[in-house]
Curated annotation (Swiss-Prot):
It comes from the Eukaryota. This is Small cell adhesion glycoprotein. Residues 58-97 are cytoplasmic. O-glycosylated. The O-glycan is modified with sialic acid residues. GO terms for cellular component: cell junction; cytoplasmic vesicle membrane; nucleoplasm; plasma membrane. It comes from Mus musculus (Mouse). InterPro entries: SMAGP. Residues 1-36 are extracellular.
Amino acid sequence: MNNLPATPSPEELMTTPVFQAPETLSPQAEEASTALIAVVITVVFLTLLSVVTLIFFHLYKNKGSYVTYEPAEGEPSAILQMETDSAKGREKEEYFI
């Protein structure tokens, strides 16, 4: 009867890495990993803050920079110039059929 395998102990049953208990870290290693996580979060936050700040200043600086080429209302020379340009354009029209 010695040839029959004995029932494995619970520790032997947990042979896959998924079921094995995780190794406990030393306090120094745990502090180091916590510090690393804090540094990564801080760098990401500062990067996002700087990008938002740059976008804000860019939008503030370029506010109202849209330029139109239309004459201001009330300028008679500009209105006269527009009328003469349209008259010249009518003289040079060609129609192809």
